[in-house]
Amino acid sequence: MKAKAVRLHGANDLRLDKFELPEIKEDEILVKVVSDSVCMSTYKCAILGVNHKRVHEDVADHPAIMGHEMAGDIVKVGAKHQDKFKPGMKFTLQPALNYKGTMWSPGYSYEFFGGDTTYCIIPAEVMELGCLLEYKGKAYYEASLAEPMSCSIGAFNAAYHTHMGVYKHEMGIKKDGKLAILAGAGPMGLGALTYALHRDIRPKMVVVADVNQERLDRAAHLFPVEEAAADGIELHFVNTGKMEDPAAGLKEITGGTGFDDVFCYAPVEAVVELSSAVLGRDGCLNFFAGPTDKQFSARMNFYDVHYNSTHVMGTTGGNTDDMIESLRLTAENRIDPAVMITHIGGLNAAAETTLNLPKIPGGKKLIYTHLNMPLIALTDLREMGEKDDRYTALADIVDAHKGLWCPEAEEYLLAHFEQE
């Protein structure tokens, strides 16, 4: 079968290639990818090439398909998996395979397996690990976003707290505690926020701090503080760039106690140091954002580590249980991953979008892999409608949903735009 995909040939070398997929083996599955959301980790992979720990050294000879936040339809199933998977099933998958101790993952390491493609082959190890998941929901994008949501879910589940003299950790964020998300008004921060407000074990205070007022205003629009208060959560949106002393200002919001849980969503020295400075007693700092600099470092208050039991950790990705939780909470309408999406586009836009991701404002960029479409901000749909009525129809649907992408918008898009 012929496929078209964005593939990595080397550092800063992404190409939209057409190629022939081999026939699947008895332990493999052929799938049609419908949607793939672009991850900052994919940008890091693209600029580093073979210097990225998930990229094979022979990528120039065996280019790797980019993208790992994918969803689509199963097309053909190898004999070994026909009892569980059937053609026509919708799927998503957990890409953090960690297979036999390796770092290999779709979107980084595989020649015929990734998300920025029309079709791909899912290898045996994915099914062996239970990482291929049937998706029973309606919208493909919600299944794509289950992966980035699972990263934040995993971060919340990996947090831990202690009791003096007790050598056993209490896993998860502190119930009824005070939680901060620093550099938190970007797409991943908003994903963490929707989860913090609607998970089973919740904090009583959430502070979202950022230096981008436009992002903070959008976040406040999507998450009204009054609605959070009705659920018993005190929610604050704070621009630390306007504070003379951000650490003192954030601590003041907590009544001087500091935070029980702090999530750092930017690999920036000043943000990491601020995260350390606002920890309360037994505060857990999760350095969520992965740097590209292997020598990246920042100062941390080790007096507090010793005397106040503060601690630091980092998580990268979630696990299959986190993915399942994301899909469940989305199906129950408790979380809305669409808060992360600000742009849509076709496969033809994926390479340029990936290589320029830090320069493009807004949140998640959602790629529909069978469409030929430029990358378009949801806020620009109505302007695009001046030349094409279909964009006006999309703008009407999006505006009716608080400016968010939604199942109705995806359904209209896939029905009215030509697919390859």
Where are these regions (language model features)?
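Glycine-rich Rossmann-fold phosphate-binding loop(s) that bind the pyrophosphate
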Residues: P148, A183-G186
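C-terminal hydrophobic helical "lid"/dimerization subdomain
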Residues: H163, H221, E244-K251, A270-A277, ...
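ADP-ribose/adenylate-binding Rossmann-like module
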Residues: D261-V268, A277-F296
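Adenosine-nucleotide cofactor-binding segment
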Residues: D176-G177, L182, L193, L197-V271
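NAD(P)H dinucleotide-binding glycine-rich loop of Rossmann-like/cofactor-binding domains
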Residues: P95-K178
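Hydrophobic/small residue at the entry helix of a nucleotide-binding pocket
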Residues: C151, P187-M188, R215
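Rossmann-fold NAD(P)-binding glycine/threonine-rich loop
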Residues: A270-E273, A289-S309
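Glycine-rich beta-strand-centered segment in the early N-terminal region that forms part
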Residues: P22-S37, N51-K100, F113-G114
